[in-house]
């Protein structure tokens, strides 16, 4: 599906992971379906392996089996690393779901540092390729008086992704669907949500 028009109530899925401790081998991943950055239409979840390589498949399965799938127009994720260094392949997720994927981060990523950190894990080369495959890092100011957010995207042009991010950043510089997913995931896994995504 090619995203060309960004309506005010575009159906967006925001995804983030919850807290996991050093003894945990699995982590909760929560998806929140919202209309723009205003109304919650649904919540979905899955689990992924800490420092594994299954996040792309688990999220694709979560999305494709959801009753909300027909209404979804774009997936927003909180970065490309989940549950430690379980690296999300945004291009593969786009291919498997047919939806544009925008990975959002608060600070400009240091790709070299991420690639270096991956050397401590198994299947280093596979992880490195996924990180590099995410493509160039873009930026957008979603709120007038706040710093920009950074993003990588698959299945959508950067200029259209910028419109999506501005439209969904209704209360903070990060898109509201990602923030709500963060609050739910950390609230469930820690007993209380943290103050910010």
UniProtKB/Swiss-Prot annotation:
Stated name of the protein: UPF0215 protein MK0057
Q: Which family does it belong to?
A: Belongs to the UPF0215 family.
- InterPro entries tied to this protein: Endo_dU (IPR002802)
| Native species | Methanopyrus kandleri (strain AV19 / DSM 6324 / JCM 9639 / NBRC 100938)
Mention any Pfam family matching this sequence: DUF99
Which residues form each disulfide bond in the chain?
none
Judging by the UniProt lineage, the source's domain of life is Archaea
